Structures are given as structure tokens and as C-alpha cells.
């Protein structure tokens, strides 16, 4: 046996040290997740957000248009991988220090370094300490395992193998445990208890939701008029967690006087309940990022007009997650500040404690986690405009085809949703022969409100064999949806939806 200063680590092959470090990194990430769950306090959250904000606009556009939801998932996976690598470096540092001292110090150094790095990235002490302990534990247990093997004069290969197996076992235990604990945590936030101030529980909400259920066409597989899986699109992979008791909304910029509103101020105002649909500018033509909900809130103009507004220009909405969007001040006239959704407090993923709703416009300007309304004297680029998008205008008219059912009598039933913003939907037509002939679809009765979608359905005898079904909509102004297809980038998708039916 070698008589070096520290035979345990001197005998350790480099590849084994790296593998142990990577396993320790996995445990550290799991430890962070166990406490933080999928919030900004989770180590991968800020890293994923940083990548999303700093990657070239062309790459972000490719991810949105080509990869869709897969792009967001890959961003998270890459962030987890980078987090693991960062913690692995801390584990390697611990092993390097351990070569020059007694072996237990390696785990301590790895733990301390991991915790310090995590705090610097997340500003969250508790998840960082747990991440450090998890990382250090794997390093410590693997060192102890090999130390026992060396002390008993076990062969080098066996000692190295024991070290690696100890790292695998401890990392697996900590990793699985951390994932289970983190997954079981609720990432929702509850509104503060304010006596008598729960506008989302108003008695008129249940009848409105019941009306929407009644007006839904009941087509199998078709999402109802009030969406049960409302889409979410954000610039970060983790949503901010805001405390409503300390949250405030400010009105700033070129105003006569700046104003600030607390959550309690908002809830004490006269509220309204509105059905409003939203559609993502970056979705595919027949994608599923278009939904509808019953929102509870107050008029944005009631908040900004007391500040004294200029004649005309524009407004910048800023959010707690670093997002910001600019659009004409005129679009704010019918703006709505939502604090409730479908009879519940606004969910965290949809902007708790408050979000903006700008009727008839693409989803990107309906800013979540709203903290500031800045009135501008001249135009500025918003977050997505800086990346080449132009999604601050009115939404394009669309009729989507999401359901193709075969009925018991052999007939085909197709269905979907149609939406044209505040222009409304007057008509949906269906062609079952590739666009040669057209027939009117059945539309759901309109919901109360000016910015809502409608369901449509059409049943027909199939011609036999493969055929093309095409759908198109006419808005409430009498304008037919344009036929020519366009990419989501930069101003949103357009065109008639076509599907092959067999």
C-alpha cells in the first residue's frame, strides 16, 4: 500500500472522483427541490430564467415556433443539468481539499461550497443549506466507504468500487426522497385573510359558471366553454411566489402624481366578473394555447385615471418576474385587473395576486404578477419586441379543429373553438372535400362578454376513405378569416385549419 499523505484519495482514479461528484450534484439538486419545490428558490429556477433571457432571440424563436412546449421542457432539463454540474464542481473541490487533510473534511467543504453557491444564485437560505447537506453527505459516505476498504487492505478495484457504490446508493436515496418531497409540496399561495373581502366568492359567480356549462355543446373530447386546463406561458420556468400582504401595484411615469395600491385596496374596490379568452401569439395555428375563464377584478382605468394621464401614447406593464410589455394607451381603456379566476383566488401560475387582462389582444400583453403600470411619453420595445416579435396588437381570427369523433351510426363529428377577440364570432363553416363546398357549423350560444370564444361542431356522412376537413370563421364584423397560412413569428399564426380524416 502506498504511504502517501492521504491514501484514500490518492488511490482514487480521476474518473471515479468525477462520477462521485456528479452523483453528489444530483443529490444536491434533489435536496434543493425537496424544500423549494418548483419555485424560484429551487436552484434550477433562476438558471433556467437566466438562459431564457440571455439566449439569442433567433434561438428563442426556434424553440417557441418549432419545439413548442418541448422547448420549455428542454430549458428546464438543461438548467437541472447545469445545476448538477455546478454542485458537482463543489463536490470536486471538497475532494481536492480532502486530499490534503483528514478525509471527513471533504464532505464539509462540499456542503459549505454548495450552500454558498446556491444562496448566491437563489437568495434562498433553507433550500441552499439542504442542498449543501445532501451534496456533502454523498461525498462523506463515499469517502467513508473507501476508507474502510483501504483500512482492511482491500484491492484497489474493490475499494474504488465500494466508494462508487456508496455514492450511487446515497445519491439514489437522497434523489428519490427529494423528488418525492418536492413533488408533494403545494406551490399555490393563499390570499391573506381579509374580513369580508373575497370578491371571487361573490354569489353571482356560480350562476355565470353554470350558464357557461349549459351553453357548452357537450361534444366528447372538446374542452368546455370555461377551460379546465388553462394554458400557461412565461419567460421563466418557475413562477414567482408573492406575498399579497406586501405586494403593491404602482402607477408611474408621465402622470400628474404617482399612485400605489395594496392588495387590500384592490379588493375593497367595486369588482366585476367577466368571461375573457386569451390566445398565445407563439402557438401553432391549431395549437392549444387558447382558453377561456371567468375572471374577477376591477377596471384598470379606475386605477390609473386618478394619477392624471397624458393625451395619448403608450403604457408599459411590468411584472415581478422581470417581464415587461408596451402597447398603446388606448388599449388600456377596457383593461381589467384580475384577482380571481373561476370563483377562486387567482392561481399562482396565472399571476397571483393580480394580473392584467387587455381584451382582444394577444396573450403577451396580459401581464401576470403585475407590479407597475408605467405611462410613457414615447414608444419603447417590450420584452418580446426586443426579440423580434410583434404580438401587442389584436388577435387574429381562428377556427380550430380539435375533435374528430365517429358516432354510433357511422357519421363523423368534428368540433373545436373559434375566436376573434372583441370582434366576436358570427359564423364557422366546414368543408369535408378540401374546400370545394362549405356548410355552416353549429355554434354554442355566446357567453356574456365581448372577448370570448365559441364552440362549434358539425356532423356529416363521411364520403368514404380519406378526405380533407377544412374550417374557417367569420368574425362579428363580417370579415372572413384569411386563408393563407402564416408562421406564429412574428405577429401570430393565421390561416384555415385543415386535417386529414380517415
Predicted ranges, named:
Residues 84, 184-502:
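Structured, non-membrane catalytic/scaffold regions adjacent to prosthetic-group chemistry
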Residues 132-145, 170-184:
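Alpha-helical membrane-embedded segments
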Residues 70-73, 175, 375:
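A short hydrophobic/aromatic micro-motif that marks alpha-helical segments and, especially, helix-coil
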Residues 1-102:
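Membrane-anchoring hydrophobic segments
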